[in-house]
């Protein structure tokens, strides 16, 4: 059984000039219970390279992690991790070119993100990729003679690079997953900064909020040039993480997933444009303290997912998790957040703009980050509110300021319960803030394949000018909460559609194996009659409008 002394003393090192090769499509794995340093070359073309830690007895690990340390997966400045694809071609007896054009491989440093749960399997080691290091998971191409098409340039997609740590991320190297050529997609970059459970006696150093900062360009490496794992002892900061938009675009990535069990903060003006997908998992999204007040953040992809994190329980009897999950900032709102999906935009779990957390048993230092003054979520197709991934509570999208939701149609997914709140102050709604619903085209799209969902929209002022649907479910606009929390005005604008009708909708919905119990997604279905309520208190079906004033304009349905 490994001891704390072994964790501190054992090292795995691949030195400068060392080269490890495996056959194309095969794997290289290097793990250590202590420090892991790579300054050589690892070649697994079209295969997999994994750098990680080794699990030890929980009683040993808990004590070590509670004290804090500087052990890391350190990818040094001369390191090359190459899983880029190489096409293999030959010529047959008739002079025709044939071959295999495989896609880029996979590099995993520390762990990976599980998109179904919003949890990362991260290492209890810092992840450090020094400037000069190169991680390459690009695709390939080859000229082949295809039957019926003749000479054709065939290209493959880029692979995947995943970096995950429970401690901190220092990402100054080069990450590449280019498309192999025209017609093929770029690869995927996944970056995760997780927050584990610590003993409640843990040192203040480890009980820090995790904050993954996204900036436009590099503001200078936080570690001095020439640093070594030994030289930075005591210099690595728990909760540190930084990634630049330049790194993403220069790497040729078409898919980006970011996870922070705490904050994803934007440092000034940032623009991220992905060719396929963008997924953000966090306790809150906000602006850094150094970001200028008029900062503008633009996030664009065909598919966008905004989600919370799965590991968000704060404590047990003897364990604490120093995480930040939303909260109302004490600072004024600032800047603009614009999120646009050309196909589909999904919202899941608890999505918060702005954050605040006081110093506590779990969190050694309080933290406060500004919410966006204006948030625009736009989908040229559907905007879906999905059921939470881990528990039975509702999905929630919350901001202190104005919120605009614009899509072809907006609806909860099957069985999902979701709530959207603008102007949140922790008490009554901010009377100066508005929740606006809009549409991207004048024609109504076909009914979504969704039933029995529930969606509530809350703000002091609600302007409904879009297409809101919840077939055979419930839609609730406004809150009649008396003096402390009430909607003042609901405006149903011309061309708006607010509907729970399922007329003409045909879709599969579960089944029965015994002729008695009907199940959907493995669970027994609870069907409520008209006017019934769920255990959460939400109406099971129908449209509810609650507010001090209701204004229904011509052509609102």
What do these predicted ranges mean?
Residues 1-557:
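Extracellular and secretory-pathway beta-repeat/beta-biased strand scaffolds
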């Amino acid at each position: 059984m490994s001891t704390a002394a072994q964790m501190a003393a054992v090292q795995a090192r691949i030195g400068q000039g060392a080269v490890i090769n495996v056959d194309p499509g095969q794997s290289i794995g290097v793990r250590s219970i202590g420090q892991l340093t790579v300054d050589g070359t690892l070649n697994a073309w079209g295969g997999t390279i994994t750098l990680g830690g080794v699990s030890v007895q929980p009683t040993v690990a808990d004590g070590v992690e509670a004290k804090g340390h500087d052990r890391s997966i350190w990818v040094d400045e001369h390191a090359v991790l190459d899983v880029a694809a190489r096409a293999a071609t030959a010529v047959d007896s008739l002079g025709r070119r044939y071959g295999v054009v495989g896609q880029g491989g996979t590099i995993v440093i520390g762990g990976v993100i599980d998109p179904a749960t919003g949890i990362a399997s991260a290492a209890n080691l810092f992840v450090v990729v020094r400037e000069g290091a190169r991680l390459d998971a690009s695709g390939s191409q080859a000229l082949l003679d295809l039957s019926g098409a003749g000479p054709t340039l065939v290209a493959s997609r880029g692979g995947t690079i995943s970096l995950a740590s429970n401690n901190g991320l220092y990402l100054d190297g080069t990450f590449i997953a280019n498309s192999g050529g025209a017609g093929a997609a770029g690869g995927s970059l996944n970056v995760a900064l997780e927050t584990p459970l610590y003993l409640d006696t843990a040192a203040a150093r480890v009980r820090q909020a995790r904050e993954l900062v996204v900036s436009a360009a590099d503001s200078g490496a936080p570690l001095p040039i020439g640093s070594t794992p030994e030289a930075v002892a005591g210099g690595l900061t728990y909760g540190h993480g930084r990634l630049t938009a330049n790194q993403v675009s220069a790497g040729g990535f078409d898919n980006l997933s970011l996870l922070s069990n705490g904050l994803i903060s934007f440092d000034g003006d940032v623009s991220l444009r992905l060719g396929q997908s963008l997924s953000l998992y966090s306790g809150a999204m906000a602006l850094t303290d150094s970001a200028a007040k008029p900062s503008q953040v633009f996030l664009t992809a065909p598919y966008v997912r905004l989600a919370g994190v799965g590991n968000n329980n704060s404590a047990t009897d003897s364990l604490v998790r120093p995480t930040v999950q939303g909260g109302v900032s004490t600072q004024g709102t600032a800047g603009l957040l614009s999120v646009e999906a050309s196909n589909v935009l999904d919202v899941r779990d608890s999505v918060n703009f702005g954050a605040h957390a006081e110093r506590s048993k779990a969190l050694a230092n309080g933290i406060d980050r500004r919410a966006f003054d204006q948030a625009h979520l736009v989908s040229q197709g559907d905007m879906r509110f999905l059921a939470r991934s881990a528990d039975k509570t509702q999905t929630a999208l919350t901001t202190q300021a104005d919120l605009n939701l614009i899509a072809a149609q907006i609806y909860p997914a099957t069985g999902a319960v979701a709530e959207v709140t603008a102007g949140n102050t922790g008490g009554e709604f901010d009377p100066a803030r508005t929740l606006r619903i809009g549409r991207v085209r004048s024609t109504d799209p076909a009914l979504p394949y969704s039933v029995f969902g529930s969606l509530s929209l809350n703000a002091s002022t609600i302007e409904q000018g879009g297409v809101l649907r919840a077939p055979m479910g419930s839609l609730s606009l406004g809150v009649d909460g008396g003096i402390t929390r009430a909607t003042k005005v609901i405006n149903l604008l011309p061309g708006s559609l607010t509907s729970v009708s399922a007329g003409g909708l045909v879709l599969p919905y579960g089944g029965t194996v015994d002729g008695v119990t009907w199940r959907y997604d493995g669970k027994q279905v609870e069907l409520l009659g008209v006017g019934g309520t769920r255990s959460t208190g939400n109406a099971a079906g129908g449209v509810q409008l609650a507010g001090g004033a209701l204004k229904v304009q011509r052509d609102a349905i």
